[in-house]
């Protein structure tokens, strides 16, 4: 009888642990996932996947998101690193055809997007490693392309957003919009 009671008790505890663990997976994220897709030309598909942090009354540029590379920390193996251009997992861009960004060719594929902000021009990095958490393990040797762009002042945007504008038959401007800045980069066929 003791053995049977112990088995029932252990089964009950395991069920509680399983239910609790399962419930953890369904928590609402602080920075919700989002995605935006644009077609250009006959069949070029561009998709940006990202997570959307909120301003929440904070100063973003030069504070929450530092200018230049972020200082080394315990997650980055003592190395400085660029901003992940969003929150949580890497922000990614996926293109199905060759395009030009900043006059340079980017082959078809899926790339992580990282940025190095400054008070004037920003560097946007398209990196071949598209499956990591943030930019902590960013490796410059895996860069597919780096372009320099100039951010522009914009209306206040609480949640980080990527979108497309200035759409033509052979080009589009993709941009990040957050706080009071837009960071545009033109994509040409």
Predicted regions and their residues:
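Targeting-peptide/extracellular-domain and disordered-appendage signature
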Residues: 24-107, 112-189
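Bacterial Sec-dependent N-terminal signal peptides
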Residues: 1-25
